[in-house]
Amino acid sequence: GITRFATDGFLMDATDEEFALLRKLSMMENAICLKGQAEFALGIVTGNNAKHLLQRREAGSEPILRGSDIERFRIKGASSYIHFAPGVYQQIAPVALYRAPEKLLYRFVGEKPVFAYDDRQTLTLNSCNIVIPAVEGMDMRYIMAVFNSSVIEFWHRRVNHSMKLLRVHIEGFPIPVAAQEQQREIIRMVE
């Protein structure tokens, strides 16, 4: 049933039609999920944003993204800047995860999943988290397209029942396996 992909909710409020669709999605033969195939990182918790964040870029500072700085498929641009000093923050993931050559950024809180692609090693605050998929033969931008789809929005709303997007939710999203050419076509559509 619905247990093939990770879920943490009950489907008591789903209509028969919705349940049938969720069951069909969960039973897809040619699909994978990210559980065990991705690294996750929380955005930086500075401990004192008023002290550490800048509203304007200055010499030696760099952009840092909030959840509100990303939209589906794109980074709008940073609304804050920071003089990056990893040792002084309340909570920080390994720096290598922020500096990964490519990664997906996602809003931690929102009505629907919002994912953007980053290949500029941009820092993020804790409202903008990181997932780095490592699925052989699957382009990260294709995974972003799937995660921004109305199908995954429906899945998240009906299965996870949460305004927060947790690691366990992302690990359980069904991702259709697609040939390289199909992936490239989908990526072209969303770029």
Q: What residues fall within each predicted segment?
A:
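A short, charged helix-loop
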Residues: 1-2
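Polybasic, glycine- and aromatic-enriched phosphate-binding surface used to engage nucleic acids
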Residues: 11-185
